[in-house]
Amino acid sequence: MRLTNVLFKKVKSKRIMVVLESVVSGHQFNAFRDRLADKLEIIRFDPYIQQESLYRERKKIRSA
């Protein structure tokens, strides 16, 4: 094993994929955000209720 292999660190991605869930109906979709950013809260059209609704980040899925 070479010394250079030991010195390399695994690089983390700058963005992560998260699940956003509607507060009103429970509709979910995936979105990307920066790893260091705060949790997402956005207003977006909800197809279940046919109106705009608040979506909150529910959980992290994976690095991207």
Curated annotation (Swiss-Prot):
<dbReference type="GO" id="GO:0005739">
    <property type="term" value="C:mitochondrion"/>
</dbReference>
<dbReference type="GO" id="GO:0003735">
    <property type="term" value="F:structural constituent of ribosome"/>
</dbReference>
<dbReference type="InterPro" id="IPR038584">
    <property type="entry name" value="Ribosomal_bL33_sf"/>
</dbReference>
<dbReference type="InterPro" id="IPR011332">
    <property type="entry name" value="Ribosomal_zn-bd"/>
</dbReference>
<dbReference type="GO" id="GO:0032543">
    <property type="term" value="P:mitochondrial translation"/>
</dbReference>
<dbReference type="GO" id="GO:0005762">
    <property type="term" value="C:mitochondrial large ribosomal subunit"/>
</dbReference>
<comment type="subunit">
    <text>Component of the mitochondrial ribosome large subunit (39S) which comprises a 16S rRNA and about 50 distinct proteins.</text>
</comment>
<keyword id="KW-0809">Transit peptide</keyword>
<comment type="similarity">
    <text>Belongs to the bacterial ribosomal protein bL33 family.</text>
</comment>
<dbReference type="InterPro" id="IPR052008">
    <property type="entry name" value="Mitoribosomal_protein_bL33"/>
</dbReference>
<keyword id="KW-0496">Mitochondrion</keyword>
<keyword id="KW-0689">Ribosomal protein</keyword>
<keyword id="KW-0687">Ribonucleoprotein</keyword>
<protein>
    <recommendedName>
        <fullName>Large ribosomal subunit protein bL33m</fullName>
    </recommendedName>
</protein>
